[in-house]
Amino acid sequence: ASALAAAGACLAAGMFTVLHHPVPGPRVSNLAAARLAGPVAAPSPATGSAPAAAADPRKGVAAWNFTGARKALRLSGASWFYTWAAGPNGISAPPGARFVPMIWGSGSVTSANLAEAQRHGHILLGFNEPDMASQSNLSPSAALSLWPKLQATGMQLGSPAVAFGADQPGGWLDRFMKGAHRRGYRVNFITLHWYGGDFRTAAAVRELKSYLQAVWQRYRKPIWLTEYALTDFGASPARYPTWSQQAAFVTASTAMLERLPYLRRYAWFALPSNSTDGTVGLYRSGARATAAGSAFRLAPGR
C-alpha cells in the first residue's frame, strides 16, 4: 500500500504537547502512516558524500525501507533501528547498526513473528500505541492476556509504547504496569513516544525532559524513547516547525537525552523524508540528508 493510502488508516495516531504531557490529536503525516504501510518505494536521485558518523550506543531511528536506507542508516550514526515489525522489512543494516524487533499488536502475536523476533537478538519492543484506536488499539487487559507469549521468548521486553500520558495515574500504561505486577509478569523497560507542539528549542527540550523524568519517577525502570520529534498533531492539518527549528531541537534534545542516566535508548521519528511530511524526516531518497538529518548525524554522543 502507498503511504498516502495508509495515512487514512493512521488518522488520529499522534499527539501534541501541553506542558510535558502529550495529548492525542489527529496524525495525518505520511511518515506516521508507514507504521502500517510497511516498506515504501522511492525514486533514486544522486546521493551526497557526507562521511558516516560514529555510531552512538543510544542513538536510533524509526525506519521503513526506501532508496538509500542502508546508506542513510550508516551516515546517521544510529546504532539501532526498528520498523514496527518483527523483521527489518528489507532494510539491510550497515555495520554498527542493529535491528530491534517489535510485536506491533494482537494480530502480530503469532509463532512465526515471535520466532522471527528471536532471530534478531535479545530485545523485543511491545505493542505500538495500544491507547490509540488507529494503532494497535488494545485495552490493558487485552495486552496483559497476550503478554505471556512475548515473555515466553525469553527476550528483554519493552512495555507497550503509549502515545501519551505514560506518567498519569490511572492511564493506559499505569493500568498495564499494575496488572503486570499483580500477575508477576516481566517488563524490563518502559517504551515511550513524544511529540512537541511548542517549537521553541529550550521550551521543547524542557517539556520532553520533564515528561521523561515524570515517567521515571513513576515506574523506576529504564526508558526507551522510540518516537520523538517536533510536530503539532493538534492542528489540522498537522503543523511543523521550520527546518532550522527542527534541526536546533535535534541538537539540543540529543544533548539532553545523552545526559539522562535512566534513558537507555532513543529513536528519532523518522529516518526517511518526503515533500509531504513536514520537517521530521532525516534523509530523502538516495540518502540525501535534510537539515534535521545533518543535525542528527552531527549530534554529540556520550
Positions of PLM-derived features:
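N-terminal low-complexity, Pro/Thr-rich disordered segments
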Residues: 15-57, 302
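Aromatic- and acid-rich polysaccharide-binding/catalytic face
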Residues: 83, 128, 173-214, 218-235, ...
